[in-house]
Amino acid sequence: MKKFKKIILWILGIVASLGIIAYVSVTNHPQLVVGVIQSFMYKESSPNSYSPLYDPIDGLKENGQYLKSEIAYSKDYPNSFLDITYPDQNLEADRPTLFYFHGGGFFGGSKNMGDPLAASQSTYLIDDIVSKGYNVVNVDYALVPDYHFPTPVIQMNQAIAYIKEHAEEYHLNMDNVVLMGSSAGAIMVAQYGSVLANQEYAQLLNIEPSIAKEHVKALVIDDAPLDYAKFSLGTKMLVGNYVSETIYLSEEEINAYNPISHVNKDYPASFLLGSEYRTDMVSLNKALKQAGVENELVDPLAEEGLEKPHGFVANLRTDPVSAKAFERMMTFIDDRTKK
């Protein structure tokens, strides 16, 4: 019996040791796990490409909206392509311009497929925003493992600069702009808000804003994980991998990543949506209130006792709570762009 006990303890010791080794390995190198997910998503292709994934389109969609797709906005980084969707073929009509940045944990997603982490169809969301009278610029950006923070924010700035330079060509009003992002894209938008408002933060990221703050009428920040210290292990692995290829970020790296501590009175008016990362949105909401910044938070758990999935607003066609959140969002940005 003692012999068997020793064998069992020996086996348990080996299993525990292997578990510790595995934990240390994946937390220090989360790309080991993220890379496996990417291999299933992209198979033999790469998540980053200097060529567009699809043939360019310049014409009417089935729903009557007009699409110009696969426009290269820079040659500096891969995935530097954007699409522009207009409500109809009257491209010269003066409308607000909304930039949209997709989610995907900085390892997946695209302007065409939306956010693979969200239980929703974000491409419908784009169409429904366009139908409300907005020209929407839908932007792609580079992903891990080749590119890390703050590269996507730099690309965001490049996309805005490109459209500003070509505004007349594409009939886009760059004096009346909304920036919107979901999940990873919401992180970028929240960070860009602090870039616009806070020169020290802009210098920290080495980004010179390509648009004047007064021309950005509103931000829409859809469920952005921002407060690194409060993240679950899974979220730390995704964000840590994006920032520095490890979950063990330095204080300096966390300070650069989290825009909440850099909020001031000049931060743009913001509409916040909270579900999986509602506590982060509550923290941002409080910081904006303290700074005297106009903002509104949609928090279904606090307001209606309902837990909604990540990126829930994109379910507006099938879920009444999402539809109501969408209408509140549109009212918020309409009030700042159409009056």
Predicted regions and their residues:
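Alpha/beta-hydrolase superfamily serine-hydrolase fold, recognizing
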Residues: 3-339
